[in-house]
């Protein structure tokens, strides 16, 4: 996955309201983040799959960062 896609994903995470990141279930959050990223960066199907898997492995980190922002 390109650095452009990674930067865009983390930019989206930072810009997303904390309540969204904390209250969505895992599957919905992964799908939502993939969709938001694909709106801004043209992704091929294998990149969509990889991005979804990457997000799944980072959900704890994403939620921890969101929790920090809420305090």
Question: Which stretches of residues belong to each language-model region?
Answer:
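N-terminal functional modules and adjacent low-complexity/disordered segments of proteins
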Residues: 16-17, 38, 56
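Intrinsically disordered, low-complexity regions
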Residues: 18-21, 40, 47
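N-terminal acidic leader/helix
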Residues: 1-28, 63
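DNA-recognition alpha helix
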Residues: 31-40
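Amphipathic alpha-helical interaction segments
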Residues: 8, 28, 32, 50-54
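Short, charged early-sequence alpha-helical segments and their helix-coil boundaries
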Residues: 42-71
């Amino acid at each position: 996955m390109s650095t452009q896609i990674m930067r865009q994903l983390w930019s989206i995470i930072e810009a997303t309201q904390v309540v969204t990141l904390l209250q969505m279930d895992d599957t919905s959050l992964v799908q939502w983040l993939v969709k938001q990223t694909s709106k801004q960066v043209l992704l091929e199907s294998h990149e969509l799959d990889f991005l979804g898997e990457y997000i799944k492995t980072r959900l704890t980190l994403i939620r921890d960062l969101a929790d920090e922002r809420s305090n």
